[in-house]
């Protein structure tokens, strides 16, 4: 049975999450609250919220866990040309934290295959906006001709980034934002992005699954590191164009 958490109740061990044979693998707990303090504690333990309007707050820690190692980010020949154009043409901009709430709302409105409605509710937007104001959540945004056309947002503690959602109004706009994030994190020696759950799109970009035990162990170490700077320089993206994917960083995680 999934435990119900009162305001002062701690999270159970992630090992108590429902298993693959259940109808909701990875479900750990439920609660009525989504306080920033609860959200911060969750991420530091490798737990995230995911629920729909009308449901209680559901907390998850799936096994295995989908991650993206920045050194393993895959760039196709076609996308390489796109990145070169973004770097070359001033009409393309990559901004950080310029319109965090706008990115969240756009992610909420983006159509998703096989999904009706959105889990990015008004309550979720309020909670993550609180983290953003505290400097713990960030948006990476793709702008074209002065208009935001894509982006992503996530949570950052220490040397760990937890990706949440992305959207694109024009082709490749979300992928450009992800490439910018990868380049920025590589610059700051962050070796793992949490992607939560497996999708074919993430796998095509180099994402892969690792055991929850290995994921949680890495999170525990990474969140204790000093926070990274979120001053962004577009030129760091150029480093992705001349460097092949490396398996070096991957050696720290089991496959």
UniProtKB/Swiss-Prot annotation:
The GO cellular component terms are: cytoplasm
This protein's source sits in the domain of life called: Bacteria
Location(s) in or outside the cell: Cytoplasm
Q: Which reaction does it catalyse?
A: N-terminal L-lysyl-[protein] + L-leucyl-tRNA(Leu) = N-terminal L-leucyl-L-lysyl-[protein] + tRNA(Leu) + H(+); N-terminal L-arginyl-[protein] + L-leucyl-tRNA(Leu) = N-terminal L-leucyl-L-arginyl-[protein] + tRNA(Leu) + H(+); L-phenylalanyl-tRNA(Phe) + an N-terminal L-alpha-aminoacyl-[protein] = an N-terminal L-phenylalanyl-L-alpha-aminoacyl-[protein] + tRNA(Phe)
Q: Which Pfam families match?
A: Leu_Phe_trans
One GO-annotated biological process of the protein: protein catabolic process
Name-wise, this protein is Leucyl/phenylalanyl-tRNA--protein transferase
């Amino acid at each position: 049975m999934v435990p119900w958490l009162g305001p002062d109740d701690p999270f159970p061990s992630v090992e108590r999450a429902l298993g693959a044979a259940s109808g909701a693998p990875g479900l750990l707990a439920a609660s009525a609250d989504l306080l920033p303090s609860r959200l911060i504690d969750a991420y530091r333990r490798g737990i995230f919220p995911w629920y729909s309007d009308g449901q209680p707050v559901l907390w998850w820690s799936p096994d295995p866990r989908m991650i993206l190692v920045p050194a393993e980010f895959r760039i196709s020949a076609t996308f390489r040309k796109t990145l070169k154009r973004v770097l070359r043409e001033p009409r393309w901009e990559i901004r950080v934290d310029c319109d965090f709430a706008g990115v969240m709302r756009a992610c909420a409105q983006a159509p998703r295959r096989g999904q009706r409605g959105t889990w990015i509710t008004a309550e979720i937007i309020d909670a993550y906006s609180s983290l953003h104001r505290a400097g713990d959540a960030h948006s990476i945004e793709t702008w074209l001709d002065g208009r935001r056309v894509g982006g992503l947002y996530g949570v950052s503690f220490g040397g760990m980034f937890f990706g949440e959602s992305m959207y694109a109004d024009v082709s490749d706009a979300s992928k450009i934002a992800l490439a910018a994030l990868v380049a920025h994190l590589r610059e700051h020696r962050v070796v793992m992005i949490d992607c939560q759950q497996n999708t074919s799109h993430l796998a095509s970009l180099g994402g892969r699954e690792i055991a929850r035990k290995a994921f949680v162990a890495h999170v525990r170490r990474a969140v204790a590191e000093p926070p990274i700077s979120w001053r962004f320089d577009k030129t760091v993206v150029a480093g992705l164009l001349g460097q092949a994917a490396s398996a070096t960083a991957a050696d720290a995680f089991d496959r």
